[in-house]
């Protein structure tokens, strides 16, 4: 009997050691994996919208299709139609892939934006506009629609911060700094990659390997807040009346600084 109890105790002790070793090893693997990722955290699991706040009443228009976040610009939410993370961030670098699926709406009022952020004028002082097949979305930073890194098809290119560029109360140097240095977008339907860095009140945007915004000052930007994917566009009598957010997103990662 004593021998049997000793054997049972020994087996239990060995089992305990094996479990402890497994837990310890698993912890090491997790740590090493985290270290290998360099501190990057995934904001999208490729399967569902866990970690995101879907607008109330959306009706399934923000959805996951084939491993990407897909939006058809038709959210039925009565209020905000944007998609937000359920976590707030302060200083960070955000990486994500995005693409414009199609551009069924032709925007007849697209201005030609100059390097200082102003619009090109004709001899009468009127803004020169052109017609462009357009789609419009963007990345909201720190919970602020004004601090939006734009996604669209305008000739100036994606990456600009529209809310600051168009704010006439901002100093000229601020408005110029949030205007893209170059057009770096790929063709409509192709994937693009943003790397967006926010540190204090300063923003840098790299689009497809090109720095389009470098250390732009965003006076008054919130100290922290969630990341948002923008809704834009609406229909009238079944036809698009403004540039729709016909966009997709994938490979969304963030590293806090």
Residue ranges and their predicted role:
Residues 1-10:
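N-terminal secretory signal peptides that target proteins for export/translocation
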Residues 12-25:
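Bacterial N-terminal signal peptides
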Residues 29-257:
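Carbohydrate-interacting regions of secretory-pathway proteins
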């Amino acid at each position: 009997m004593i021998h049997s109890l000793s054997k049972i105790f020994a087996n239990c002790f060995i089992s305990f050691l094996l479990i402890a070793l497994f837990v310890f090893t698993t912890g090491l693997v997790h740590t090493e994996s985290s270290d290998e990722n360099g501190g990057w955290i995934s904001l999208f699991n490729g399967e569902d919208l866990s970690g995101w706040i879907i607008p109330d009443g959306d009706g399934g228009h923000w959805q996951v299709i084939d491993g990407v976040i897909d939006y058809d610009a038709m959210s039925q939410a009565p209020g905000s139609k944007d998609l937000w993370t359920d976590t707030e961030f302060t200083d960070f670098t955000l990486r994500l892939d995005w693409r414009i699926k199609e551009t069924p709406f032709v925007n007849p009022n697209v201005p030609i934006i100059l390097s200082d952020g102003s619009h090109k004028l004709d001899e009468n002082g009127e803004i020169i506009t052109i017609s462009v097949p357009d789609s419009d979305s963007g990345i909201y930073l720190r919970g602020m629609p004004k601090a939006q890194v734009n996604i669209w098809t305008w000739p100036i290119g994606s990456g600009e911060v529209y809310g600051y560029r168009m704010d006439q109360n901002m100093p000229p140097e601020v408005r110029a700094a949030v205007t893209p240095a170059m057009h770096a977008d790929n063709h409509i339907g192709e994937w693009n990659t943003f790397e967006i860095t926010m540190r204090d009140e300063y923003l840098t945007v790299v689009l497809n390997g090109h720095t389009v915004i470098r250390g732009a000052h965003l006076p008054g930007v919130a100290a922290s807040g969630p990341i948002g994917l923008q809704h834009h566009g609406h229909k009238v009598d079944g036809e698009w009346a403004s540039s729709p957010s016909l966009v997709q997103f994938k490979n969304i990662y963030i590293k806090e600084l």
